[in-house]
Amino acid sequence: MSRICQITRKKSMKGNSVAHSNHKTRRKFNVNFFSKRFYWVEKDCWIKLNISANGLRTINKIGLDAAIKQASKKGYLIIQ
């Protein structure tokens, strides 16, 4: 499972870990990512989404159905 949000398409990014001596080493910034089950009322079924915290806020703000339609329109999510 790749760590990419299915709603917002957020993914990890790379950068530098900077020490006090200004010595830089490469590191990875991970997304606040988890998998969560949602009950989709329109389809009358449970779905499991891999989402970030920002994706969860989007679902809370505009609703599950609108968020899924928006993500599938952008090509982030494929619905059967």
Swiss-Prot record:
Q: Does the keyword Nucleotide-binding apply?
A: no
Q: Which UniProt keywords apply?
A: Ribonucleoprotein, Ribosomal protein
Molecular function GO labels: structural constituent of ribosome
| InterPro entries hit by this protein | Ribosomal_bL28, Ribosomal_bL28/bL31-like_sf, Ribosomal_bL28_bact-type, Ribosomal_bL28_sf
Single GO BP term? translation
Family label: Belongs to the bacterial ribosomal protein bL28 family.
What Pfam families does UniProt report for this protein, alphabetically? Ribosomal_L28
What is this protein identified as? Large ribosomal subunit protein bL28
Q: Species name for this entry?
A: Azobacteroides pseudotrichonymphae genomovar. CFP2
Gene Ontology annotations for the cellular component aspect, listed alphabetically: ribonucleoprotein complex; ribosome
Q: Where is this region: Disordered?
A: 1-21
Entry superkingdom: Bacteria
Gene3D superfamilies (UniProt xref):
Ribosomal protein L28/L24
